[in-house]
Amino acid sequence: MAEKIPSISKINELFQNKEMKPSELFEQVYETASYTESVLHAHLELFYDEGLKLSKESDKRYTKNESLGLLDGIPIAIKDNINIYGYKTTCSSKMLSNYVSPYDATVVTSLKKAGTIFTGKTNLDEFAMGSSTENSAYGPTKNPWNPDFVPGGSSGGSAAVVSAGSAVASLGSDTGGSIRQPASFCGVVGFKPTYGTVSRYGLIAFASSLDQIGPITNTVDDTRIIFNEIQGYDSKDATSITPEFTKLDNKKIKIGILKELMQEGVSNESQNEVNKVVNLLKEKGHDVTEISLPLTEMALSVYYLIAPAECSANLSRFDESDMALEKMHRQVMK
């Protein structure tokens, strides 16, 4: 494991105080990637030349005290089912092995405007269908804590690069746990935002009514910073909404704990950790109340009806595409 990378706020402080340059940080994470990738295979492609160029532009902004904000100069990795103009988006599939994106996903546009530096595209289970990142056409990703273990999936590459220190943060996509589960396996923070709060424009769909793009980071505060940058209404996504957030400050709030998620099937260790947080919140004066959603037990069954139906419809559009497969290969497949 590489030396732990500071939080985004701390990095920004180092930049502002001229104690570190964005180009130095980029070189650091690239060096980490260069000696971990042979084992982990978390990045499918690294953007060294472009990243170094943009990081030096960020250097100049900080020198002139004209930084674009907290994310200016921060190296972030992007899951390879999210489009970046001019780069391949393969979804870890041979079907899209030659597809070069002609446009940016909305989240990518937002991060570019914030001065983010992209480290590269990360590995995933093919078309984001899987939970181990073993089912990639380009080979499996390993867990940075122990290469004999899987990193989870489908955003296993995005979780692994953050855990290994070859990116400060990353974006993944989550349909039924594909950000949260690999983040847990790799010991980092994964967040699936509320559906509609982050635009899906430019995300190659798995199940359109369940997919959501979200951040994987080292800290909860880093997650907040990235989410604030990528959230918001987008006219290019018909399911996009305008989020309404309430600033809590030090207000006392009422918090529900879902009874059905604190029962059989949830490990004692997990329940104990949740209970520690519950006790802390109570000590702070918040009202923590047990609530019940009886239909929770049906959620997995409903997921396995919706997800296969929608992914079948979404993936059928690639059947006659010439994005990747040469005619000779197509003849072999027929």
Q: Which residues are covered by each model-predicted region?
A:
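An N-terminal boundary/leader segment
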Residues: 1-53, 283-285
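Flexible, acidic loop-helix segments that line cofactor/substrate-binding pockets
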Residues: 41-46, 238, 253-254, 258-261, ...
